[in-house]
């Protein structure tokens, strides 16, 4: 467990890394720019062409990466603590599967691409409702919720495959970039709304940090300390699901961010969720913009979906952990 001085230093380092990640991702693209040029654009001291590139194209993409990374990581941290399961994250709890189903439904109904994130959000919350209903009979047991999430994901994935098998190539292409987690497709209006919801959700979850600490000890221990575990688990689960659903709906399924970042922060800071939740949010806000920068430079001019980079990075990280385990 890190002491107060170390916590301050760690958070200071995270903020510095967040600034570096922001400017690195902002400077990355077909027209390379230095950090100084990016700063000049943000301060309004650059030429019109640079301002157009940064403010209209890159800035929304980078901000989307920051808020999505923060939302997925914070919600993953909470899911792991409340369910006492290290594999709990939006992907394994059915949130991502529901979001994909919503996007597929939007494609079949031939709605505007602007509405794909809205359909995705509805699908994500449909999945959350299904997991909630299935695990309710088991008093929201952590294993029951994980199994319910996996089952719901399989059902939605199969349904999506059925929908796509009956769709035209044009319809499938309409949602392809979203399904691949393409950060460049974000709508500015939706980004602003999503950012407000994500930040508010993370703030609420952080306020529940002490209660989450008690719940993570087990239901009996929580009751001994006078806390109604089931009541708080419902409230916290719904809040974390809202943050995750908004994050996924904004730019598509970007897996493993909510799984890996909380593990890293827990190893650095310990298990106190009062500091772990905001630290995980900061870690995600650093990690996803970095993945965005890598995805645009690794095989340039070919641009890879960010989810490919997050998946590779997470796989390498967990293989490293397994190789070090005694």
Regions found by a protein language model. Give the residues of each.
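Alpha-helical transmembrane segments in inner-membrane proteins
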Residues: 1-326
């Amino acid at each position: 467990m890190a002491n107060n001085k170390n916590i301050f230093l760690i958070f200071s380092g995270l903020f510095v890394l967040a600034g570096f990640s922001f400017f690195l991702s902002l400077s990355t693209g077909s027209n390379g720019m230095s950090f100084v040029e990016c700063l000049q654009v943000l301060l309004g001291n650059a030429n019109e062409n640079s301002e157009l590139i940064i403010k209209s194209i890159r800035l929304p993409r980078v901000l989307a990466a920051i808020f999505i990374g923060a939302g997925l990581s914070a919600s993953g941290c909470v899911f792991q603590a409340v369910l006492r399961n290290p594999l709990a994250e939006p992907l394994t709890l059915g949130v991502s599967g529901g979001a994909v189903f919503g996007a597929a439904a939007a494609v079949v109904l031939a709605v505007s691409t602007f509405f794909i994130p809205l359909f995705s959000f509805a699908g994500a919350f449909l999945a959350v409702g299904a997991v909630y209903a299935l695990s309710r009979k088991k008093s929201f047991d952590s294993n029951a919720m994980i199994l319910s999430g996996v089952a719901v994901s399989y059902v939605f994935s199969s349904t999506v495959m059925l929908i796509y098998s009956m769709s035209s190539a044009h319809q499938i292409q309409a949602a392809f970039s979203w399904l691949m987690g393409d950060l460049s497709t974000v709508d500015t209006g939706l980004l602003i709304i999503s950012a407000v919801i994500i930040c508010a959700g993370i703030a609420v979850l952080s306020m529940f940090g002490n209660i989450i600490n008690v719940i993570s000890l087990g239901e009996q221990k929580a009751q001994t300390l006078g806390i109604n575990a089931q009541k708080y688990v419902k409230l916290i689960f719904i809040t974390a699901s809202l943050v995750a659903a908004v994050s996924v709906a904004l730019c598509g399924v970007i897996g493993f961010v909510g799984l890996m970042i909380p593990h890293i922060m827990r190893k650095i800071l310990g298990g106190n969720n009062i500091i772990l939740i905001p630290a995980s949010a900061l870690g995600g806000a650093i990690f996803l913009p970095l993945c965005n920068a890598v995805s645009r430079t690794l095989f340039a001019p070919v641009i890879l979906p960010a989810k490919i980079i997050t998946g590779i990075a997470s796989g390498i990280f967990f293989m490293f952990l397994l190789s070090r385990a005694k």
